[in-house]
């Protein structure tokens, strides 16, 4: 499944309705995971946009980013969409404020030579796409539209 970098803020912060891109982070403290894609994206943006200036604050893990966001020590977090969705469930009070602005594909690693296993995994994935299971699971667990439970239930009824 695909993902990408997003921006998250504290739900009740003054930035909850104003930050939509890294350009909007001018003058703010931006949390990223040390050495990760979030750091590379935030730093590259600064390098390519000299008119924008924000302080990059690096953390050993994304939990530290979110913890300091909620504590008010940083203003915004750059994180992977899927990772942030999980963290937002565990640490209430954060809000994703934009769609992914990078593209990242996720994969399942299979040991070289395990062709039967690879074929089985690919067949399962194809089946999930074909019968609507993938879309229902995405909506139920990832999509924040608020209609996740209803869409997943409809897909289950169709599959039965």
Identify the residue ranges that each predicted region occupies.
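Periplasmic-binding protein-like
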Residues: 1-11, 81, 85-126, 144-152
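Beta->alpha turn/N-cap motifs
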Residues: 10-11, 33-36, 61-62, 77-85
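Surface-exposed, polar/charged faces of alpha-helical domains
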Residues: 13, 20, 51-54, 71, ...
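Ligand-binding clefts/hinges and TM-proximal coupling segments of bilobed small-molecule sensing domains
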Residues: 37-57, 89-97, 125-160
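Alpha-helical elements of the RecA-like P-loop NTPase motor core of helicases
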Residues: 39-40, 66-67, 85-86, 119, ...
């Amino acid at each position: 499944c695909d993902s990408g970098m997003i921006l998250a803020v504290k739900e009740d912060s003054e930035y909850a309705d104003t930050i939509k891109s890294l350009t909007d982070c001018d003058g703010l403290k931006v949390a990223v995971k040390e050495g990760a894609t979030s750091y590379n994206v935030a730093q590259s943006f600064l390098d390519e946009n000299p008119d924008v200036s924000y302080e990059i604050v690096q953390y050993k893990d994304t939990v530290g980013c979110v913890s300091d966001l909620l504590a008010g020590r940083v203003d915004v977090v750059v994180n992977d969409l899927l990772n942030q969705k999980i963290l937002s469930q565990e640490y209430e009070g954060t809000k994703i404020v934009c769609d992914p602005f990078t593209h990242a594909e996720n994969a399942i690693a299979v040991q070289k030579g395990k062709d039967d296993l690879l074929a089985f995994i690919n067949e399962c994935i194809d089946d999930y796409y074909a019968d609507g299971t993938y879309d229902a699971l995405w909506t139920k667990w990832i999509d924040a539209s608020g209609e996740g439970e209803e869409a997943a239930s409809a897909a289950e009824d169709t599959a039965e």
